[in-house]
């Protein structure tokens, strides 16, 4: 599982215009068809190109180890849960391995991953996750993002609010020295949240994986070792 893209870069594929397709959907389709990470994910059996973002984060910060309990927020279509399952060797049926995934959208089952199709913001969802964990989590990770509308400031704020909710939840369920990973979009309003995170974790870093599209303002907040 490397990020070597040799053999995955195809010739540029043009997308024909269609009366039924909006400009934004045509642009998205064009990016997908010409994205080497999309092709690589398909060939290597990952649900999405986002899998490589988490692999890069782990390669940089060495977060995952066997016998961990992990919560994956905004899990669909399941790429991050797939990666986590491989990295903690969930297939060895260790009683200490546990991955709890949640999303509004349904995902195909993943071995050794317990999935709940729920709204994270519903009143009883946090308690459901806590009960399923049966103990404290080692990692809470969130790739949640709001549906983008193309207005950078609005997209930034909406995704930042999701990150804040994930952070507050992480404080409740993480064990001491646990880690928190979350997507944010750069836009200037994130500093207040970053200051909160720094008060609760010993090390806080920003990281933009090479598998993140260069034109995107997304970065990942990596908070290590909860106090």
UniProtKB/Swiss-Prot annotation:
Catalytic activities: uridine(2552) in 23S rRNA + S-adenosyl-L-methionine = 2'-O-methyluridine(2552) in 23S rRNA + S-adenosyl-L-homocysteine + H(+)
UniProt cross-references to InterPro entries, sorted A to Z: RNA_methyltr_RlmE, RNA_MeTrfase_FtsJ_dom, rRNA-MeTfrase_E, SAM-dependent_MTases_sf
UniProt keywords, alphabetically: Cytoplasm, Methyltransferase, rRNA processing, S-adenosyl-L-methionine, Transferase
Transmembrane segments: none
Positions of the catalytic residues: 183
Disulfide-bonded cysteines: none
Subcellular location(s) of the protein: Cytoplasm
Main location as per UniProt: cytoplasm
Protein purpose: Specifically methylates the uridine in position 2552 of 23S rRNA at the 2'-O position of the ribose in the fully assembled 50S ribosomal subunit.
The protein's name in its UniProt record: Ribosomal RNA large subunit methyltransferase E
Natural source organism: Rickettsia felis (strain ATCC VR-1525 / URRWXCal2)
Lineage, broadest ranks: Bacteria, Pseudomonadati, Pseudomonadota, Alphaproteobacteria, Rickettsiales
Encoding gene, per UniProt annotation: rlmE
